[in-house]
């Protein structure tokens, strides 16, 4: 599946990886795709042309236009449809004459595909030998399929995020402001907000573990007095810390967005805090947070 331009064949992923689901592409590649396709020009096909090739209807495309990152939303929506794959995406980009995209992103797409294959092989190798008929001690993989609004119900193409947001219901207004500042601006980050993105009907502990460990690159903790009383937030925080002891991978980012009467949680004191309450640094708050969440 080579592009038409000179040298494009070496940039596009090889056929052995192009049949992979779109979930193989990480957020970095998706954001760079958005940089190419979100721009409306007269000389190059943009995301709307891609949406039409993906068989999206007029009203669906108009709805996607309302998002700050229509290309990102398009990919999220398309990956749950039959026939969506890395290879099909490259075919459509070639058909639209976007050889520039293939040349620029081909190596990164190939790298993502190879990482996806390696991870699948590792997970398969680590599976314990168990008899399905009698094994009831661990949850089935299918139980964690279709847990978010844009998930493939069969679990083949799970929805992925830049960050999981750990918060209490009483802090939802600040979370909504976070959505406006990080998703609906040029940062174009994708946040996992339970009340918005998670479907009801599954064990909250299983969902949180799946999302934090496998679907989200980082976790933002909205710290408040109410947070200290939440067993769910306590579990999510400790689980995230267990995945990155000593915070060496910068996986967890605490946020203090209002004054607290109670003492700041001791398990988070060794991690640099984003302090929204400090008037001297408030103007830098969203930029610092966005850059922290955008790190590879």
From Swiss-Prot:
Residue stretches making up the TIR domain: 159-293
Name this protein carries in UniProt: Myeloid differentiation primary response protein MyD88
InterPro entries on file: DEATH-like_dom_sf, Death_dom, MyD88_Death, Myelin_different_resp_MyD88, TIR_dom, Toll_tir_struct_dom_sf
Pfam hit, one: TIR_2
Keywords of this entry: Cytoplasm, Immunity, Inflammatory response, Innate immunity, Nucleus, Phosphoprotein, Ubl conjugation
Gene3D superfamilies, per the entry: Death Domain, Fas, Toll/interleukin-1 receptor homology (TIR) domain
GO BP field: defense response to Gram-positive bacterium; defense response to virus; inflammatory response; innate immune response; MyD88-dependent toll-like receptor signaling pathway; positive regulation of canonical NF-kappaB signal transduction; positive regulation of interleukin-1 beta production; positive regulation of NLRP3 inflammasome complex assembly
PTM info: Ubiquitinated; undergoes 'Lys-63'-linked polyubiquitination. OTUD4 specifically hydrolyzes 'Lys-63'-linked polyubiquitinated MYD88. Deubiquitinated by USP3 that cleaves 'Lys-63'-linked ubiquitin chains leading to inhibition of MYD88-induced NF-kappa-B signaling.
Entries under SUPFAM superfamilies matching the protein: DEATH domain (SSF47986), Toll/Interleukin receptor TIR domain (SSF52200)
Origin species: Gorilla gorilla gorilla (Western lowland gorilla)
Free-text note regarding domains: The intermediate domain (ID) is required for the phosphorylation and activation of IRAK.
Gene Ontology terms: cellular component: cytoplasm; nucleus; plasma membrane
Its biological purpose: Adapter protein involved in the Toll-like receptor and IL-1 receptor signaling pathway in the innate immune response. Acts via IRAK1, IRAK2, IRF7 and TRAF6, leading to NF-kappa-B activation, cytokine secretion and the inflammatory response. Increases IL-8 transcription. Involved in IL-18-mediated signaling pathway. Activates IRF1 resulting in its rapid migration into the nucleus to mediate an efficient induction of IFN-beta, NOS2/INOS, and IL12A genes.
């Amino acid at each position: 599946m080579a592009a038409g331009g000179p040298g494009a064949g070496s940039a596009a992923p090889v056929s052995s990886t192009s049949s992979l689901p779109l979930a193989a592409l990480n957020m970095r590649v998706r954001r760079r795709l958005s940089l190419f396709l979100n721009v409306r020009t007269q000389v190059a096909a943009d995301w709307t042309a891609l949406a039409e090739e993906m068989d999206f209807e007029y009203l669906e495309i108009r709805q996607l236009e309302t998002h700050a990152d229509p290309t990102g939303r398009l990919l999220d929506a398309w990956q749950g449809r039959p026939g969506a794959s890395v290879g099909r995406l490259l075919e459509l980009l070639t058909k639209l004459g976007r050889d520039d995209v293939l040349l620029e992103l081909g190596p990164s797409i190939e790298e993502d595909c190879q990482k996806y294959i390696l991870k699948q092989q590792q997970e398969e190798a680590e599976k314990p030998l168990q008899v399905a008929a009698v094994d009831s001690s661990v949850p089935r993989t299918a139980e964690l399929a279709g847990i978010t609004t844009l998930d493939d119900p069969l679990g083949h193409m799970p929805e992925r995020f830049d960050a999981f947001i750990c918060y209490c219901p009483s802090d939802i207004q600040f979370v909504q402001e976070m959505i406006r500042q990080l998703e609906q601006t040029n940062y174009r980050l994708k946040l996992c907000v339970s009340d918005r993105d998670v479907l009801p009907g599954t064990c909250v502990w299983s969902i949180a573990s799946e999302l934090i460990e496998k679907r989200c690159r980082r976790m933002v903790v909205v710290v408040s007095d109410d947070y200290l009383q939440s067993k769910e937030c306590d579990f999510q925080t400790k689980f995230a810390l267990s995945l990155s002891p000593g915070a060496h991978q910068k996986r967890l980012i605490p946020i203090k967005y209002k004054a607290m009467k109670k003492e700041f949680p001791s398990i988070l004191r060794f991690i640099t805090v984003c302090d929204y309450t400090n008037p001297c640094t408030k103007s830098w708050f969203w930029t610092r947070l966005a850059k922290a969440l955008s790190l590879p």
